[in-house]
Amino acid sequence: MAKKSLRVKQARPQKFKVRAYNRCLRCGRPHGYMRKFGLCRICFRELAYKGELPGIVKASW
């Protein structure tokens, strides 16, 4: 419940620009956020593993 209220709170326009922060679009996690994809590291890893993110491949060298 707390996470849902924080997602709603974050979505509202902030009175001050400094208060704005990014949240994962999928799960709402505020930390480990990747701007390029709009996802947290955990959701990014899950989707990349399933092959649902185009152009993302596992590194091998």
Swiss-Prot record:
Cofactor binding, per record: Binds 1 zinc ion per subunit.
A GO MF label: zinc ion binding
InterPro entries assigned to the protein according to its UniProt record, in alphabetical order: Ribosomal_uS14, Ribosomal_uS14_bact, Ribosomal_uS14_CS, Ribosomal_uS14_sf
Source superkingdom: Bacteria
One BP term from GO: translation
Chain sites annotated for binding Zn(2+): C24, C27, C40, C43
Keyword Chaperone: no
Function: Binds 16S rRNA, required for the assembly of 30S particles and may also be responsible for determining the conformation of the 16S rRNA at the A site.
Record NCBIfam families: PRK08061.1
Subunit structure: Part of the 30S ribosomal subunit. Contacts proteins S3 and S10.
Protein name: Small ribosomal subunit protein uS14
Biological classification of the source: Bacteria, Bacillati, Bacillota, Clostridia, Moorellales
